[in-house]
Regions:
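Conserved structural motif at the start of ABC-family nucleotide-binding domains
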Residues: 1-3, 15-18
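Catalytic Walker B motif of ABC-type/P-loop ATPase nucleotide-binding domains
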Residues: 138-141
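Conserved ABC ATPase signature
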Residues: 113-117
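H-loop/switch region of ABC-family ATPase nucleotide-binding domains
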Residues: 174-175
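Helix-to-loop junction immediately C-terminal to a conserved catalytic motif
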Residues: 47
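H-loop (His-switch) and adjacent beta-strand-loop-beta switch element
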Residues: 187-200
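The feature captures the beta-strand-to-loop junction immediately N-terminal to the Walker
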Residues: 32-34
Length: 208
């Protein structure tokens, strides 16, 4: 995935320009910057450039309306690019859904109503949905939001393992800098109206 001379606007305001970056298979990249730097706008821009749901799965901060659906139902929505909106799940689809639920440690919540979950539990279910989509690229906007510290660490280690073991390319936008830097391969730092690719060693949270 390449970004070549990308400009980002929020309304009529240009928030960043001349963005050049590349996300490679097997990489876990941390997207950081102050509020308003354009991190969420960049993620949405990438989705506009690469709209194929079999290529990129995404976890955004927007709340989803899934009244009366169970956690399993929500995770199964990740299979829609392969089944269609009203498509019947195959045995393989069911196995992928179950595996994704287990990876997030949500087995005991699988048959619970999504709307009864805490914010942290909902976040895990949405990440499981993204995993069930089985895409080579995953974009996550604040994936560790609402999670307690052990769950933040566990989430980052899971994302790291997906990169190493399955060759997925993952971009996460986060304010949990110290936790993320423990697992990330490199940093995309948004500041001063542009983006800089940096190694983890060369980046300091003091820059924010």
């Amino acid at each position: 995935m390449k970004l070549n001379n990308v400009s980002l606007s929020y309304g009529k305001k240009v928030v960043a320009s001349n963005i050049n970056a590349q996300l490679l298979p097997g990489e876990l990249v941390c997207l950081v910057g102050r509020n308003g730097a354009g991190k969420s706008t960049l993620i949405k821009h990438i989705l506009n450039i690469y709209p194929d749901p079999k290529l990129i799965s995404v976890v955004l901060t927007d709340k989803i309306d899934v009244e009366r659906l169970t956690v399993r139902d929500v995770v199964a929505m990740g299979r829609m690019p392969y089944t269609g909106f009203f498509g019947k799940l195959t045995k393989h689809d069911e196995e992928v859904v179950t595996s994704s639920i287990k990876l997030l440690g949500m087995e005991d919540f699988a048959d619970r109503q999504f709307t009864t979950l805490s914010d942290g539990e909902r976040q895990k279910a949405i990440i499981a949905k993204a995993l069930a989509q089985e895409t080579p690229y995953i974009l996550l906007d604040e994936p560790t939001a609402f999670l307690d510290h052990p769950s933040k660490v566990s989430c980052m280690k899971l994302l790291r393992s997906l990169c190493k073991e399955q060759g997925k390319a993952i971009l996460i936008s986060t304010h949990d800098i110290e936790v993320a830097l423990q697992e990330c391969d490199k940093v995309w730092w948004m500041a001063d109206g542009t983006l800089r690719e940096m190694t983890v060693d060369s980046f300091s949270p003091n820059l924010l």
